[in-house]
Amino acid sequence: MLIMVTGVSGSGKSEYAEQISCQLAKDNKKYYVATMYPYGEEGRSRVKKHKLQRDGKGFETIEQYQNIGGALKGCKRDTKPVVLVECMSNLLANECFEENGHPDNIFAECMQLYSECSHLVIVTNEVFSDGCEYDDSTTDYIRRLGELNVKLAKAADTVVEVVYTIPVVLKGDISYVGN
């Protein structure tokens, strides 16, 4: 199953995506694919917060800042794992603004990763409603994220927007997620 979880910063989407991943994995292997470079104090603080949030949930962390399709390369697997990717906005920024980036390959690489898992949970951000105008490179990034999110939503079995920690189903079903 391919599940996309979206929401604004601080909405609770990460914790919800972890809950879904744990429910789906049961006793199966779970990987948390971290895509954010921990730049500066804010970045390090966010990484620390997410690590504490995952503590004790059985995730093995993979840091994969680009080329998401290769995230499981080198991982020993007896069965197909559950994979949680956190998050598309960071991955896209890395592919757009870092050396040797390939932003146009992200969707295909996500589908490659999906073919290697039993379930893929992808977290993305809702950054489209602030009403601000930006420079050309930021506008291009926001456009690309929108296009990527549309492709992922079309491919996904389930799409959930988390609003103030409340999951709102936009597509599919979440009855498999316990309270």
Model-found features: residue ranges?
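Short, Lys/Arg-enriched, disordered terminal segments
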Residues: 1-2, 78-79, 173-179
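Conserved P-loop
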Residues: 2-75
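Structural motif
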Residues: 4, 82-84, 121-123
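Residue-level signal for inorganic ion chemistry
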Residues: 17, 50, 84, 125, ...
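Residues at the starts of beta-strands that form the adenosine-phosphate
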Residues: 28-31, 81, 119, 158
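Helix-adjacent hinge/juxtasegments
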Residues: 57-105
